């Protein structure tokens, strides 16, 4: 995963030039329909080898420690295996690509040149205006409250717009709307598709859909982005997964 390594080294002022190969991208170009191109999966698939998992050296969940806290002997064995397996995967995968000129061309002229470009984009990050986001979040919250009040007025009483159970009761029991879709357990569905299907039969489903769209904007963007700004750079740093099918 050259992109990851380039970013780690860049954090220490080391700029890598002349990148030639990436075993993850070799696997991706060779078999783009495969679901996994990570080192552990590729080692098992092409080398028949079970790698040391990160959780085995650092733990998992709440008890997981940072790699800097792993004892030196264990860290060295893990890192050495990582380097060794990466080379062995390249030796296994490169002959395959090299034997198919069209695939080699894609790899050498598109995928590999793209690696440092994406790495640079990740390092640069995206400048975020926190003040604008906060204002937008407040505006969204105000509009959501208005939609909530409208929904309560239409239903004739207050209810939780975020509760599928309460929505089922209001829409299908109290208002008597005909459910077009069911959940796996046979209950009337209140997901987006189900509400769209009945939105022309009553105004409440459309109010709920509008409320949900604003709630998603607020939770995913205006509230979330401010919380993931890197305090050192003042930017949001994205991650681009090159070895995947769009």
Pin down the residues of each PLM region.
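Conserved beta-strand -> loop -> alpha-helix junction used to position metal-binding or nucleic-acid-contacting
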Residues: 15-31, 39-41
